[in-house]
């Protein structure tokens, strides 16, 4: 039985482009600048006391091979690095400003709780009076199930009344909340992230008060089990501690998850405030909202004081203002001068405190930062981002629940650490994904210098019936986050899709209608915060949005070829994006299984094997995608340790390859976010690179290395080559800092498998701030390198600034000798001729002298059958568009792509071909397109397979989850009729020694 995988189904959404507004991005041209080859070691085995030996020693002394650290050493550095960061940022967490006078509060922690019954619907007084069966719970309280339900919270309390007003405040309740005080309905609210309150002074009494809270949940607009709801919720939340339903993929439950209290206030009090900094003019505009309960117009005195919050400075500001005030909300603006302000940024998050007082009685405080974040909408391509007028590139990851749980659990030390875990791996921003969160999270990001993108909780679509409610909640979102210098950007919707391709267009907004909604939301946001940078869409599946920065999501090393093939991304192509605009990539990544220690400690026993050697498949883990998706990336494994190893190995590789590929396109990609950083629960979102126990997976460290702000990077489309080939490797400088660098030297050293230097190359160069540029090519002539069959070589580069090495990179490849005893082949068809002419394993011959017949065209089948009957020569069938569905010798052969995505990797049957590595048939070079291209796009469908040399796994369709072992589908096979293959050979033979050698070994084995 197959289960539904919603997120895999969404990933299969095809991006339909309004082409007239879109443009494809070609790779950045690499200049024809060659590194100078300065040293060549001719015979590495004969270097005793001659000059070559001295050269080797000199190279080794200055440029020792940059060995990869062990995971254990990286883990040790991680813990030490976090402690250093805690010490570094401790001063910014220490308050130096005076406190405002706090209002008196009565906080409610303990409630009786139960789900609504039929009796409650018939007689609501039963709830108000506390009849029925209740359980005791403690706030915060978030729970399941998902879907439609109603619950009640009830508590009784005494209260001391005086001449002040009494406001009941809810900091966070999900989703539709109704509040009753002493049987009076006093307050309603729809949503989950925004605080709401009401004056209940008239309904309170000294003794025996009863507070009842009705919380109603709904199905989200994404739907559940074929039903659609109206809940404005995306796919990110708090979850709950239940391994079956609560851990995984942020299920949309509900409940009162934040503080509830009654607060005493003056009849005239400060309701809200926001500071809009203007660093260009060294001023700050303070917006103050004052509420007045009195029914008459009167005078109010507003006192404002500003001083440094977390640093020592002589700056102090005090001001007294007389204003008229009416009943209700009154909005005032005050401009103050802050000369030579300390600017807020990622490294020095300086904050100020403003205290606002009304009539010398009520006080309100708020921290703010003097910073400017803006987007260039004047110069093409639009979309360059700036922090404090310096260009900036946003490098980060997605957050889905773990920070929110820190606040719920009152664990602020963990909250600090989670933000610093991001900083340690060179992130400068969090995408707090698909929902606004508790204010404490933004406050700590303010103090720790972590920039944040805040998302409105929409995913895929917006129901027409919720058009205006969603607009209202967008305003709430901006009011919720606008005070925080860390929040630099907002977005409205995640992965919108073309509603005309669904059966819900009568329910949901079309793309054009959604654009209208965006325009309204833009105006709402600008009303609340004129300086807000807006990115309307995250991961646009119905592009483009007509204003602002575009965004795409890319999972092409997990959901195969999602957005664009990995070979294209690696080469430098981008998906088609909005004309004249830069873009962002707000999600990319792969799943990596949790560490074994975490599994043993937290997983249910039924998910795990009895011992580490027992046969085990990860389909036991609820909602895990590894068993469904791994087949295009690595072998199916037998035991839990190997599954974890290969899963994490692939995740680490993908994190590095994709991050660096996106960084190389900083000319257009100004923002990137890995999906995800830290898990909120065991196996919650296994695309995370740090487990819920805060122990990193290997991918965390490759991600960290790929995000080094000033980095040297090697790029080459070939992983293998022959002796006598000339290999050009691109060298890039990726500079995410705003600093220009001159006086730079890059030294490249070619090493053999023993890390002895073979050749040395040099280039003098420079680097511009916030630019990624290819500075040149390292041309490796392999003709003078001795090889015995296969030689592992490494090209290492050392980037120096003013004589000091500041970064290194390594590119590994294999060099092969052409040691084939060439097989005579008679070719039938153009592709067959091309294979014979370009593959060093074959040579052309006539049909009488040939060892084998190679056929690639259906029109030659009769000739092949005649040869088979007359001289019984073996035949190699290359299935392609000219030879796809055919009969031969009473057997039918079809070329099928059913449940096989175009694969960059195909497993080799190592029991039949034991001399090959598991990943030898991956990331093959295509000389026709000059990039990495598919290994195979089809498998062979036939009724008889004797030997299967290369295969692919049958994969579930997107939206399904595979259970049990997967069927193997032949890609290179043999039976009595001959050898059959769907390997892509055009452009691959002659330039990929492994695929040449596999063909040779299979054919030679039958001769």
Language-model-derived ranges and their functions:
Residues 205-208, 291-378, 787-819:
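Extended acidic/polar, glycine-enriched regions
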Residues 2-87, 94-97, 113-116, 148-269, ...:
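Accessory beta-strand-rich segments of carbohydrate-active enzymes
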Residues 2-119, 252-255, 490, 523-526, ...:
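Substrate-binding clefts and catalytic carboxylate motifs of secreted carbohydrate-active enzymes
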Residues 271-275, 285, 475-612, 668:
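Active-site region of glycoside hydrolase catalytic domains
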Residues 181, 283-323, 726-766, 773-779, ...:
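Beta-strand-rich binding/interaction modules
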Residues 141-156, 164-169, 174-182, 187-190, ...:
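Active-site-adjacent substrate/metal-binding segments within catalytic domains
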Residues 528, 901-997:
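Catalytic beta-strand/loop cores that center a nucleophilic Ser/Cys/Thr
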Residues 849-893, 975-977, 1005:
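Short alpha-beta junction capping motif
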């Amino acid at each position: 039985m197959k289960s539904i995988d919603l997120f895999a189904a969404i990933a299969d959404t095809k991006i339909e482009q309004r082409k007239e507004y879109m443009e494809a991005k070609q790779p950045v041209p690499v200049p024809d600048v060659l590194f100078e080859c300065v040293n060549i070691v001719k015979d590495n085995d004969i270097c005793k006391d001659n000059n070559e030996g001295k050269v080797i020693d000199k190279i080794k002394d200055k440029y020792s091979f940059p060995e990869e650290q062990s995971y254990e050493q990286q883990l040790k550095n991680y813990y030490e690095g976090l402690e250093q960061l805690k010490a570094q940022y401790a001063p910014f967490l220490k308050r130096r400003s005076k406190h405002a006078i706090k209002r008196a509060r009565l906080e409610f922690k303990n409630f009786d709780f139960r789900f609504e019954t039929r009796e409650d619907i018939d007689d609501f007084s039963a709830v108000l009076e506390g009849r029925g069966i209740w359980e005791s719970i403690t706030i915060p309280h978030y729970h399941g199930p998902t879907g439609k339900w109603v619950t009640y919270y009830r508590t009784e309390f005494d209260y001391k009344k005086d001449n002040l007003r009494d406001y009941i405040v809810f900091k966070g309740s999900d989703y539709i909340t109704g509040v009753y005080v002493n049987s009076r309905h006093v307050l309603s609210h729809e949503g989950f992230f925004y605080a709401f309150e009401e004056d209940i002074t008239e309904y309170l009494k000294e003794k025996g008060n009863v507070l009842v809270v009705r919380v109603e949940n709904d199905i989200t607009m994404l739907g559940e089990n074929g039903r659609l709801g109206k809940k404005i919720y995306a796919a990110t939340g708090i979850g709950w501690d239940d391994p079956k339903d609560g851990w995984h993929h942020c299920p949309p439950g509900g409940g009162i998850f934040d503080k509830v209290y009654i607060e005493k206030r003056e009849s005239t009090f400060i309701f809200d405030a926001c500071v809009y900094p203007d660093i260009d003019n060294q001023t700050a505009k303070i917006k103050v909202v004052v509420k007045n309960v009195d029914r008459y117009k009167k005078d109010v005195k507003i006192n404002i004081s500003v001083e440094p919050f977390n640093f020592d400075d002589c700056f102090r500001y005090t001001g007294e203002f007389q204003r008229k005030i009416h009943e209700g909300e009154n909005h005032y603006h005050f401009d103050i001068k802050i000369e030579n302000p300390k600017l807020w940024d990622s490294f020095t998050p300086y904050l100020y405190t403003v205290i606002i007082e009304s009539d010398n009685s009520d006080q309100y405080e708020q921290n703010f930062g003097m910073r400017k974040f803006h987007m260039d909408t004047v110069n093409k391509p639009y979309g360059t981002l700036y922090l404090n007028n310096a260009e900036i590139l946003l490098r980060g990851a997605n957050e889905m629940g773990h920070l929110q749980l820190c606040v719920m659990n009152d664990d602020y030390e963990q909250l600090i650490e989670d933000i610093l875990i991001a900083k340690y791996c060179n992130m400068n921003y969090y995408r707090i994904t698909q929902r606004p969160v508790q204010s404490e999270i933004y406050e700590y990001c303010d103090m720790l210098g972590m920039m944040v993108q805040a998302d409105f909780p929409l995913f895929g679509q917006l129901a027409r019936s919720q058009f205006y409610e969603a607009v209202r909640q967008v305003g709430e979102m901006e009011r919720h986050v606008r005070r925080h210098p860390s929040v630099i950007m907002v977005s409205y919707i995640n992965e919108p899709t073309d509603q005309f391709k669904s059966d819900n267009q009568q329910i949901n907004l079309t793309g054009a209608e959604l654009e209208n909604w965006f325009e309204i939301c833009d105006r709402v946001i600008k009303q609340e915060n004129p300086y807000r940078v807006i990115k309307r869409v995250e991961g646009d599946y119905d592009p483009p949005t007509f204003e602002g920065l575009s965004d795409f999501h890319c999972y092409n090393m997990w959901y195969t070829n999602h957005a664009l093939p990995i070979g294209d991304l690696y080469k430098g192509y981008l998906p088609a994006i909005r004309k004249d605009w830069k873009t962002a990539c707000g999600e990319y990544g792969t799943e990596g299984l949790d560490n074994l220690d975490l599994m043993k400690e937290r997983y249910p026993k039924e998910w795990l094997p009895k011992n580490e050697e027992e046969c085990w498949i990860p389909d036991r883990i609820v909602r895990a995608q590894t068993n469904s998706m791994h087949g295009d990336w690595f072998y199916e494994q037998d035991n839990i340790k190997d599954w974890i190893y290969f899963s994490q190995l692939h995740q680490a590789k993908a994190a590095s390859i994709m991050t660096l590929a996106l960084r190389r396109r900083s000319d257009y990609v100004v923002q990137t976010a890995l999906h995800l950083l830290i898990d909120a629960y065991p196996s919650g979102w296994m695309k995370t690179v740090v487990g819920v126990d805060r122990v990193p997976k290997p991918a965390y460290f490759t991600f960290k290395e790929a995000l080094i702000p000033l980095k040297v990077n090697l790029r080459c489309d070939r992983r293998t080559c022959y002796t006598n080939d000339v290999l050009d490797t691109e060298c890039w400088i990726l500079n995410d800092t705003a600093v220009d660098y001159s006086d730079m030297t890059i030294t490249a050293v070619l090493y053999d498998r023993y890390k002895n230097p073979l050749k040395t190359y040099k280039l003098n160069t420079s680097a511009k701030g916030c630019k990624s540029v290819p500075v040149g090519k390292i041309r490796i002539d392999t003709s003078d390198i001795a090889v015995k069959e296969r030689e592992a070589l490494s090209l290492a580069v050392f980037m120096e600034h003013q004589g000091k090495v500041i970064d290194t990179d390594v590119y590994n490849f294999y060099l092969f000798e052409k040691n084939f005893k060439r097989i005579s082949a008679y070719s039938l068809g153009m592709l067959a001729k091309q294979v014979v002419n370009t593959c060093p394993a074959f040579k052309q011959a006539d049909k009488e002298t040939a060892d084998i017949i190679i056929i690639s065209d259906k029109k030659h089948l009769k000739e092949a059958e005649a040869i088979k009957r007359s001289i019984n020569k073996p035949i190699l069938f290359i299935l392609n568009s000219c030879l796809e569905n055919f009969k031969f010798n009473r057997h039918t052969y079809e070329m099928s792509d059913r449940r096989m995505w175009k694969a960059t990797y195909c497993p080799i049957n190592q029991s039949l071909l034991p001399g090959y590595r598991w990943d030898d048939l991956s990331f093959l070079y295509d000389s026709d397109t000059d990039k990495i291209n598919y290994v195979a796009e089809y498998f062979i469908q036939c009724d008889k397979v004797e030997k299967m040399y290369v295969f692919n796994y049958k994969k579930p369709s997107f939206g399904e989850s595979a259970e049990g072992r997967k069927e193997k589908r032949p890609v290179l096979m043999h039976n009595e009729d001959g050898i059959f293959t769907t390997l892509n050979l055009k452009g691959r033979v002659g330039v990929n020694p492994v695929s040449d050698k596999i063909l040779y070994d299979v054919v030679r084995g039958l001769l």
